[in-house]
Amino acid sequence: MKIKQIKQSLSLLLIITLIMSLFVPMASANTNESKSNAFPFSDVKKTSWSFPYIKDLYEQEVITGTSATTFSPTDSVTRAQFTVMLTRGLGLEASSKDYPFKDRKNWAYKEIQAAYEAGIVTGKTNGEFAPNENITREQMAAMAVRAYEYLENELSLPEEQREYNDSSSISTFAQDAVQKAYVLELMEGNTDGYFQPKRNSTREQSAKVISTLLWKVASHDYLYHTEAVKSPSEAGALQLVELNGQLTLAGEDGTPVQLRGMSTHGLQWFGEIVNENAFVALSNDWGSNMIRLAMYIGENGYATNPEVKDLVYEGIELAFEHDMYVIVDWHVHAPGDPRADVYSGAYDFFEEIADHYKDHPKNHYIIWELANEPSPNNNGGPGLTNDEKGWEAVKEYAEPIVEMLREKGDNMILVGNPNWSQRPDLSADNPIDAENIMYSVHFYTGSHGASHIGYPEGTPSSERSNVMANVRYALDNGVAVFATEWGTSQANGDGGPYFDEADVWLNFLNKHNISWANWSLTNKNEISGAFTPFELGRTDATDLDPGANQVWAPEELSLSGEYVRARIKGIEYTPIDRTKFTKLVWDFNDGTTQGFQVNGDSPNKESITLSNNNDALQIEGLNVSNDISEGNYWDNVRLSADGWSENVDILGATELTIDVIVEEPTTVSIAAIPQGPAAGWANPTRAIKVTEDDFESFGDGYKALVTITSEDSPSLETIATSPEDNTMSNIILFVGTEDADVISLDNITVSGTEIEIEVIHDEKGTATLPSTFEDGTRQGWDWHTESGVKTALTIEEANGSNALSWEYAYPEVKPSDGWATAPRLDFWKDELVRGTSDYISFDFYIDAVRASEGAISINAVFQPPANGYWQEVPTTFEIDLTELDSATVTSDELYHYEVKINIRDIEAITDDTELRNLLLIFADEDSDFAGRVFVDNVRFE
């Protein structure tokens, strides 16, 4: 079988061309006549469920009607007609003339042959295809799913299958296909729960299946379109122009401009990102032409910490310097009503910055964002409703600021909308009367599914629930949209990353020239963060200043950051292998030999001298150590790190590398025996040598790299694969040279592939409050996904009672946010409410290995749905580690604290507010803590 185009090269435009006569021979209208833009089919009501699908295919010139003005949506479709739709839509051609069915004499035999070769059709049991029979719903499901799987991958059946009241009536051949068609959103049952498998399919049902199928298999060509991504020095002042009937962003010359870039996280938490090296990296290495400065107002932001505004000024100046548009984001979040008292400084804030820059030659780089996410969130003040009334509230807040900013210039203004800026459709129904206004949309690809169609005409606003469809509605109704925040996770920051879904969204945004800013430039431990976070025992947090080279290395980016960088640049996303690791063990940069000495059993040990020279281990006297053969290394000088007091975990290591530095190229031979609790002595299989040709110029001498594998050194493999202990605490090196008396060794490094060690927690059990842990389970407690610590949660004895326990240590290099490295316990319980309780109380025990500096700050957070899923308890419990000796000490020598945190003073919840879950966060306040802790008797009181 021939296929004209496979998915990667089959653009949607080509698909459309291939299926211009999709419904022929059903259509009697002249398909060569040009259509007017008006939808012509009077028998398809604009309020019908099928209208968006038929309109979608008609506007793309995919289908014709049964006459010039009728579509006959409820007429049946034959098996041949639907086969023609699929084969032409997918660009399939038959490669053989051996028609497989008895009834060859039919108008569609070529398309049927192509579909057969692709595995899309199989025919009837009597050996015929029956082209003129009406196609049933189950047959359509089977053919559509086979077509999808032909171009994509085979789908797995969903774990929870869709139950239909007539499931027993679905033929065996179609049972899996009906389930997969539901997953693909191609077909579903009626409102009464019946699939009606034997009922004939209709033209309108075919339109939905074909429209949706083409959307699913269309290539994402627009991911790589960068023609409109222009810097401010190229595009100049921004304006809105009409393009293809929709308002879109353009430069001074009227040609489309798309902004792509990143949003900071809250500047009060991650303000270190505002530095020159970072802005250079974003502009030059990432290709960003825009940055968004997210200045929170509440949540310890501008309202209580006004100096955060200084970071906004710094960010604007850096954006000017490095040729990026800059969004000044008044980050309305908690509370969700921008008219709340905490936001009362908005007018003055925008006026101050507008006045400061109104005469600046790069003033047009600035974009104003007036309200990040209006929402029902009533944490710290009132929220607003997800309806017209909610939009009226936003509009009431925004209009005076818009009027003031319009008097000072024509900079683009972005306005948020209800339901966390997911409702630009509401803004389109009642827009602000001013020039250069765009409306925000926010989405997270794990939570907000795509839609390739809009709504039927007259759909009430209360039923407009798909975020992408809301964007389509806004565009179709005359307003411009800007995606000022989107992420690759779920909306709560967890789960994913959802890159396939992100590709669909970004392809849509790029196709419609909608600008976008990804959330966010942070090393916080959340999926949507762009940088590698701290996770105890796994990763160190990436510095938000990339350093003098002004580039973050790929491994410093998170999965999301690596993906988004590629999408900003419009290049293929090729993720690095994150299972590879390298650990530098001895670098000799401290001016010492780092524990190395001549081994007591070494031959000619009296002739050998070790020293540190130029931050490398120098060996003198090697003219007595000249065996460079592979197996007879025993006569060579033997060194060992007997004086090294440290150890290193080398789980998964497969190679040991050593830099060899010489005055003149020569041959050097090295054999190695790593040592540790799992391996004391095992003879090397061979010595590894480098020859004259391996050396390259290095400073005043030459350098080569010796690579010793686990095959060369069995001890390396023994330690790296031990199920008990993977620490290397020493190494023995056999060193020989051909004719060099002095050489130096440097950068002794192990590398390999990370092996994931399963963290085994004690049984989770049933969520119970009070939590006493006396049943030997965790009683529902677990690590939150954003926890900086995810070590084993076990039940241990503390002060004569069972307690929840874990080990951890805070890092020496501190992020600015003490929560980033904090253990975060998460507890979910049905019908969790405060009731008449005033406190969260529990016993906290410390078994310290190191605890002499700083403090542990214990925070509590509820995540009630009615409060925007975040309600931080205003008070904390502080443990001053410098005064640990003043704590009560138990009989088992644990430090004991009776923790009480006031929950009565939370104004935004009532006694019967559903709290959903409780987080306990043990934040680092410049402490050196390392050890084990215990939590017991968690309760409300």
Curated annotation (Swiss-Prot):
Residues making up the signal peptide according to the UniProt record: 1-29
Keywords from the named record: Carbohydrate metabolism, Cellulose degradation, Glycosidase, Hydrolase, Polysaccharide degradation, Repeat, Signal
Organism, as annotated: Bacillus sp. (strain KSM-635)
Record-level GO BP terms: cellulose catabolic process
Protein EC: 3.2.1.4
Domain of life: Bacteria
Single GO molecular function: cellulase activity
Domain called SLH: residue spans: 37-94, 95-158, 161-224
Protein known as: Endoglucanase
Active-site residues (renumbered): 373 (proton donor), 485 (nucleophile)
UniProt-listed PROSITE patterns: GLYCOSYL_HYDROL_F5, SLH
Residue ranges of the TM segments: none
Similarity-based family: Belongs to the glycosyl hydrolase 5 (cellulase A) family.
Keyword Membrane among UniProt keywords: no
Catalytic function, reaction form: Endohydrolysis of (1->4)-beta-D-glucosidic linkages in cellulose, lichenin and cereal beta-D-glucans
Pfam family, one: Cellulase
